[in-house]
Structure formats: structure tokens, C-alpha cells
Amino acid sequence: MTARNVLTSPTRAAECGAICAVAGQSQRGMREWAEAYPRLFAPKPFDAALYSTLSLAMAFSGPWFTAGQLRMANKATLWAFGLDWLVDYVATSPREAEDIARRCLEVAEGGSPLPGDDLTRMLADIRDELGASPAFPVLGPVWRAELRRMLEAMLRETRWKAAKAGPTFEEYLDNADNLGFSFVFFSHWLYVAGPDVADPATVAEAGRAVQRVIRLLNDLGTYERDVTWGDLNVLLLGVPRAEVERRLAGLAARSRELIAPLRAGSPELAGYLERQMDFCAGFYQVGDYWGGL
């Protein structure tokens, strides 16, 4: 199909319209969460475009899902952005970041959130919603493990930044859990799954492969912001852009290989993973989710 046909196809336009309508419903939910947990979402970085683009990312990645089915994908994503903001920009030392991680892990294990702590209060609400899923006996422990992996990766990055000693390219890729994609993906899967689920280890391998792809796509697309905000970025580690792009192509191909076996038994999971990767490939060529400092 030519570009002209794509742009003028009424079927494709109708599909995009339906997807955008779901995203609009989801965006309203995000704004309600931002109002419910006001200490977590500073107005400048969490601007209107952030809520809009995040909800569009989820809707286009799973166009077969309703806004209700995408509720947890959106809620966990927004929470992870709030966590990232606190760890990367609000915390003034690795010790403060470690305290944030400790509080989150305690709540994930069933503890009560601290009074006035919107981060753990929102996490407790996420935990309780997920606890009602029929898949929780199987995927609940995996969800907690994914949260721990994300927090540990975030803390590792804070230590790198504090020591002013950047990691190697391989160490950086191995730390891609700090992106939060796998945590959000498992939150979504747990929320929509029934009692019979695919093998978590197989799904996790595919999800982490996609996460590494999105990590590099993010870095290539947000280099200027990362320089301004003082973030780590693979291009700031002395890795040439051409080398990053070459590695990215290989990682994307490997991701598709790992996704392929999931299609027979879990077509929605497989499709969601691949579409997330492809959505980000287009999105980061043009924009970024964050607002301003």
C-alpha cells in the first residue's frame, strides 16, 4: 500500500479514531489519578502532553483492549514515571533514593503506606487492585520481583551518577530494568489475565528483550533532554550513534524472535509487546513524554 493510500484509507482512519477515543478515556483516568496523588506529580514535568502521549502509547500498543482493560497499564506507567521523578530529580543522594525503594518494597509486600506519602499510597492501591486478579497467585510474586528489579536498577544508576563513573555499554544495557517497561508490562498482564497464564519466564525473556530495545530508542530520541537534565544516556558513555543503531537493530530482531513463539497461545501479549516496540520506534523520532523541569 502506498503512502497516499494509507493516508486516505477510511478503514485506517476509523481504526485510528477508535484508538484515540480509548486513549482519551484513559487520559481522563490519568488526570484523576494525578489529582488523587498530588504530591507525586509536579505540574511542569507532568504536563498535559505527558498524560496524552502515555495514554496514546498504551492504546496504540493494544488496540483490541478497552480503556478499562488498559487501566492498569496506564496506572502503573504513571506511577513509574512518578517514581522515576522522585529517584532521579527529587532525591538529593543515593541514600534518599534507597529510602524511596525501601518504602516501595515494604508496601508491595503488604505494608501500609506512610501518611502523606503519595508514592506508596498509589502503589498500595495498585497492589490491592492486582490482588483481585485471578492470576495473582501465579503472577503476584513475579510482579513483586519485577518491582524489585526496577528499583535495584534505578538505585544502581543513582550510584553511577553520584560516583561520576559511567558504566560500560554492556552494563548499561544490563541495567535496562530502570526503564520500568517490564514492571508495567507485568502489571498489565496480571490485570487482564485469567487463572491460566503463559509461562512467566518465557514472557519475561521476551519482555526484557523489548525493554532493551526501548531503552536505546529512548536514549537516541532524548539525548538533548538528558544532557540538560543530567541524566545518563548511552550516547554520553562514548558509544558512537552508529554503533548504538547497529546494536539496536540486532536487539529488535532478537525481540521479534522471542515474541514469535508467544503468538499461538498468547496472541494479545505477543502483539502488545511488538506494538510497544514499534510505537516507540516512531514516537522517539519526533518527541518525548516528559514536560519541562
Residue ranges and their predicted role:
Residues 1-293:
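Alpha-helical, largely C-terminal catalytic domains
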